[in-house]
Amino acid sequence: MTITPQQLIALLPLLIVGLTVVVVMLSIAWRRNHFLNATLSVLGLNAALVSLWFVGQNGAMDVTPLIRVDGYAMLYTGLVLLASLATCTFAYPWLEGYKDNKEEFYLLVLIAALGGILLAGANHLAALFLGIELISLPLFGLVGYAFRQKRSLEASIKYTILSAAASSFLLFGMALVYANSGNLSFLALGKSLADNMLHEPLLLAGLGLMIVGLGFKLSLVPFHLWTPDVYQGAPAPVSTFLATASKIAIFGVVMRLFLYMPVGNSEAVRVVLGLIAFASIIFGNLMALSQTNIKRLLGYSSISHLGYLLVALIALQSGEMSMEAVGVYLAGYLFSSLGAFGVVSLMSSPYRGPDADSLFSYRGLFWHRPILSAVMTVMMLSLAGIPMTLGFIGKFYVLAVGVHAHLWWLVAAVVVGSAIGLYYYLRVAVSLYLSAPEQLNRDAPSNWQYSAGGIVVLISALLVLVLGIWPQPLISIVQLATPLM
């Protein structure tokens, strides 16, 4: 097969991040220099982001049987690159105090970003599996990066074992789907499934196993047990990546899979997904009520956010608006999570043992870091879905899609879940304004707003507010990001 210049341009983000991985590897082999490797990584990710403009000029195409580059792939590639950039930015001050090798951190983030970009354009079950593994394997190392702390090491072992089990379920499910249909490409699967094959037990078993594997990666109930422990044990910058890039990339590819394969037409699959969404929304919110650790709280809340997204996925067959709802919701979730985890990262930098993740560490923060407290408040309000924030626009879309598809019981779950969520998000926000304790145990640096991480957090807060009041630019971008059918 000959590769044309157009195909090379379409693959630019993938090639640039791949090249950055090689350059950073050689740089580490040549001389360990934390600043140099961090700069190379950030430059590579920025170059990949800029290259999306050229990809857009190039038009949509199938580059190989495995990868399809279209507006949809570009949107999710952009979101993954933004999350990876923020992760590297938050990691730099955190790693400054880290005693062991610092440079490999960036290498692992870049490899995981490579997996995310591959997933955004995946058009084949082989690409889906490769992408998921490329994201998961570096995360085993990243979650346990602070391995001298028992909690980080424990989180890494839990995540590794459960992730391996989930991958085997996913692979076995794919094998059963292949045995039944004789195809692995999304489009070919869609064609063969359209011929009333959705009642075959072997195919339903394969889809069931794939839902188990993907449910683990997306931390949906009942495959969520690793989530709070891993979010708490992982370093704050890694939790940022886990909550944003990996979830966005995997949900993006699941959405494409469901779009091409009319799986939603099967009543059995719809009921199973509906029950998973309902359980994730209610359980995630109820468990977050009693948490006193911010990272654990955000872990449980991420379970409920993916439950909300699942409502749009189930409604996918009933209209175009579901794609739009998911795009807007994920963008809002990305910026809100970057801000919230960014504040935790700033409070925990440089590395001094455990992160500043207990709710008590944030009590009275307003009285000596007013702007940082305002940012955290905006993020909590956005995650809760309060009007005038981007989180509200996303939640409104999900509710509209649910109503349009007549999923009344799931719409009720979203409303009840949001009401419960309001309590624990406001609990975090209110604690920032209480009287400060006599002795501060953790605090952000006094010049935090001039650091790269501080700038990322401030930009996230600004985007959440501006796009919450005037969401049209974001909605226009998401509407352009249509998958090639």
UniProtKB/Swiss-Prot annotation:
Transmembrane domains' residue ranges: 8-28, 35-55, 75-95, 105-125, 127-147, 159-179, 203-223, 235-255, 271-291, 297-317, 326-346, 374-394, 408-430, 455-475
Reactions it catalyzes: a quinone + NADH + 5 H(+)(in) = a quinol + NAD(+) + 4 H(+)(out)
Record's keyword terms, sorted: Cell inner membrane, Cell membrane, Membrane, NAD, Quinone, Translocase, Transmembrane, Transmembrane helix, Transport, Ubiquinone
InterPro entries (UniProt xref): NADH-Q_OxRdtase_suN/2, ND/Mrp_TM
Claim: NAD is one of the keywords in the record: yes
EC number per UniProt: 7.1.1.-
Entry's Gene Ontology cellular component terms: plasma membrane
Subcellular location per the Swiss-Prot or TrEMBL entry: Cell inner membrane
Topological category with respect to the lipid bilayer: Multi-pass membrane protein
Example GO molecular function: NADH:ubiquinone reductase (non-electrogenic) activity
A Pfam family that the UniProt record links to this protein: Proton_antipo_M
UniProt GO BP: ATP synthesis coupled electron transport
Family stated for the protein in its record: Belongs to the complex I subunit 2 family.
HAMAP family, per the entry: NDH1_NuoN_1
Role: NDH-1 shuttles electrons from NADH, via FMN and iron-sulfur (Fe-S) centers, to quinones in the respiratory chain. The immediate electron acceptor for the enzyme in this species is believed to be ubiquinone. Couples the redox reaction to proton translocation (for every two electrons transferred, four hydrogen ions are translocated across the cytoplasmic membrane), and thus conserves the redox energy in a proton gradient.
Alphabetized NCBIfam families for the sequence: NDH_I_N (TIGR01770), PRK05777.1-1 (NF004439)
Record note on quaternary structure: NDH-1 is composed of 13 different subunits. Subunits NuoA, H, J, K, L, M, N constitute the membrane sector of the complex.
PANTHER family tied to this protein: NADH DEHYDROGENASE
Name of this chain's protein: NADH-quinone oxidoreductase subunit N
